[in-house]
Amino acid sequence: MGELRFAFFLGCIMPNRYPGLEASVRRVFEKLGIELVDMKGASCCPAPGVVRSFKFDTWVALGARNLSIAEEMGLDIVTGCSGCYGTLRDIWYEHREKKEIRDKVDYYLSQIGKSFKGKIKVKHVLEVLHFDVGVEKLKEFIKKPLSNIKAAVHYGCHILKPSDKRPWKEGTEKPRFFDELVEVTGAKSINWKDKFMCCGAGGGVRSGALDVALHMTKEKIENAYASGADCIVNACSFCHLQFDTGQIEINKSYGTSFNMPIIYYTQLLGLAMGLSPEELGLHQNNVSVEPLLRKLGVN
């Protein structure tokens, strides 16, 4: 596997709304021997659905500034938010492919004494685990297989699309890489309706049309229940917020009584590696994960 070091891009939601997710990434990566180095001075990515849509140059300038920080560190970026991944990966890709974007980046960064030459890469947490570590290597770290758990795997949007800017060699229409990572833990990845549908939050929908966002999330949770899932597993802090906080909002709006445990991937992997729920920040979820932990026999 070799020595792995990354500039850790947190984004906004993970450290401010769900620090337990951040803790799970840090602790799992530490167990795997992967060093995460904090990016001092990093800002919002900024959000691909909102900022890119309304002020493209601002999106490019802020994103390029974040990329320049990692390049100054001499490290590839890793992030656990798919929205952040979408922004940083897209700007990195377009900087490489389009002179117009390179010119914008050069102009805006020159105003603050910075530059970006495209010498680093942008990776998602799942990308590092699947490609840099590898499924077979991960199996060596499993101490407590989660063999009685049925997981509804939620890929989300930005980790897959646009497909020409993503690294998934199997394609992005019906990928298996996330399912394979989930099944490393011993859990079963089940088939469920609308598996690849948006969580409801992205593209500014949660901010601009909460009722629409909650309707989409409600449908996904209903489908997860119908499939017999014990939990929904995600790999994006914004998707996590939408499923977790969104369930509370849905219950208030629709009079439902959803209590589907929402698990971020490194929380699931960490449990299988023998880390405690407290170490993985599972107690910080709004929707209790106790039913899942009881089924696993974890105190």
List PLM regions with ranges.
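Iron-sulfur cluster-binding electron-transfer modules in prokaryotic oxidoreductases
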Residues: 1-299
